[in-house]
Each structure stands twice: as structure tokens, then as C-alpha cells.
């Protein structure tokens, strides 16, 4: 069973200690009542992985761990098999002792777009909301963060994160909790909060922005990345049943409308840092995700539209400050 005691001990000694008033009971309830039917299969894969300490570790330019001596064919095959038990792998890529996990998303491309616009992460305590497998948390650590805490209710992501952590020498600088943002008290304890690829899944996007603000210290920085459409400050798309085959997409504003939303929620120094169309090179089917991906979600005769006829996915990065 995946344990969270190391995280509890860690925050007991720092400015997150007040979280211990609610967090252990929430996690215990999750372990008791909410485990996915495949959770034991996934957690067994993590348990059977060897705990390895990298001879070389690069989290600044990638997530790459290397051993002093190459793994044997048998060791590499076993590693490959255990990590494939945790498919599908959506967020990465990871290069672990000669095993290259080519994930659906080139999350490194997103990080390269975001990083130049951030305040220096050195020494910061960071919250990553909807963190997926935790890829970006490792990159945050590589960029100098003191502690990265991720939350994501998807239990496969938790197991993927713990698998990677185990192969990175049980690194305790990043932690993933199986929670949603709505389960967090207003901690006001994080120097930087990331919400990337979450807002359009929220039925109440302004409430989500308030929840993110509640987690930041005064003067803290929000990094918001989400789907947007072209248009002025009043433009918002509310898709019908599906958008790019996703059922749970509620609001897709223009970047200018999103800037207004952030200002309405009391953020200051709001700026649109980047806008780019998602390509089928950045999100695609691989041997680590064998189901449909972006190419199948677009109109086969017009790649500027989704299969439903909406504008194809375009994503913006906005940076804002809590005063």
C-alpha cells in the first residue's frame, strides 16, 4: 500500500503543518472507501519495482536517471514490464536507466513554453493542481523548488508517480496526494500554484480560480494553462455533449476573457504569457498509450476543427499574482 507518512512528517516541521488537521483523515477515508478496482494491480507493480539510486540524475533539462553500469537485458525487460502495467502513460516523457517512456503528451514542450515566464522557483514551495503523473513536479524540482506538492484524484497517476519516485532514489522533494482542489482547506501556504489542463474541466471556472487563490501566500504566483478560443474579452465557448471527444469540458474562454476572470477574482499583474495551437506532434498515440489521441479527435478533412466542428485545441498560459 502506498504510504503518506513521509509527507506528514515533512510538513509537521514547516508552514504546512496546519494541513495535518484535515489531511490524514481525508487520505484514510480515501484508502478505506474509494480505491479503484485496479488499484491493487497498479500498486503491486510499484511494489515489485526495485528501488534504485541514480548515478546521474537530470531534472533540469528532462526527467532522466542513469546508472553507473547499464542494466542487464533481464533487468531492463523486468523494468519495462512493470512500467507497462501502469499504462496508459499520458504525461512525460521519462528516461529511466535506458527505458524510454514515450508518453502521449510531450509535457516537456509545455514546460519549455511555461518556464521562461515564471518567477525564479529556487527555494519555493509549490502546489501543482491536476498534476497527472507528476512529470512537471520533477521539472519544478529541477528548476530549484524546495518542495512540490501535487494533487490529482486519478489513482493511476498516483501509482505512476510513486513508480517514478522509486526509480529516482525515493526522492522526497515531490509528493502526490489523491485529492481534488475542492478537498483542500484555504492553506495560503504556497509560493507558486500551477493549474495546467484543469480549468475547462470545472463546472464553475471562477470558483476554481478562487480555490487556487486560497492556496497562495500573499504575493504568490499563479500559473494557469488551459484551453482557449480566439476572440475578444467577451468570447466564451460552451461546448455541447463533447469537445474533442471529451465529455467533461464546460467553459473555454478567450485568453482576454480569462484575463478578465482572473482580475475579477482579485489577481493582479495578470499577463498572457503564451498562446499556441496543440499539434499532433505534441499529443499523439505511442506504444505507451495505444488508444485514440489528438489526431482522431480532429476533423479528418479540416485539422483546424475538432471532430464536433469546434475550433481545434489552442492553449494559453497566463501568469498572475495574489496581492
Swiss-Prot record:
Q: Which family does it belong to?
A: Belongs to the class I-like SAM-binding methyltransferase superfamily. CmoB family.
Describe the subunit structure: Homotetramer.
Q: What is its EC number?
A: 2.5.1.-
A Gene Ontology biological process term: tRNA wobble uridine modification
Arranged from A to Z, the UniProt key words for this protein are: Transferase, tRNA processing
Task: Tell me if Transferase is a UniProt keyword of this record.
Answer: yes
Report residues binding carboxy-S-adenosyl-L-methionine. 91, 105, 110, 130, 181-182, 196, 200, 315
User: Which enzyme class?
Assistant: transferase
Instruction: Give the encoding gene's name.
Output: cmoB
A molecular-function term among this protein's GO annotations: methyltransferase activity
Q: Is tRNA processing included in the keywords of this UniProt record?
A: yes
Domain of life assignment: Bacteria
Record-linked HAMAP family:
tRNA_carboxymethyltr_CmoB (MF_01590)
Q: Please describe what this protein does.
A: Catalyzes carboxymethyl transfer from carboxy-S-adenosyl-L-methionine (Cx-SAM) to 5-hydroxyuridine (ho5U) to form 5-carboxymethoxyuridine (cmo5U) at position 34 in tRNAs.
Query: What does the record give as the reaction this protein catalyses?
Result: carboxy-S-adenosyl-L-methionine + 5-hydroxyuridine(34) in tRNA = 5-carboxymethoxyuridine(34) in tRNA + S-adenosyl-L-homocysteine + H(+)
Q: Which InterPro entries match?
A: CmoB, Mo5U34_MeTrfas-like, SAM-dependent_MTases_sf
Q: Which organism is it from?
A: Enterobacter sp. (strain 638)
| Range of residues in the leader sequence | none
Q: What's the protein name?
A: tRNA U34 carboxymethyltransferase
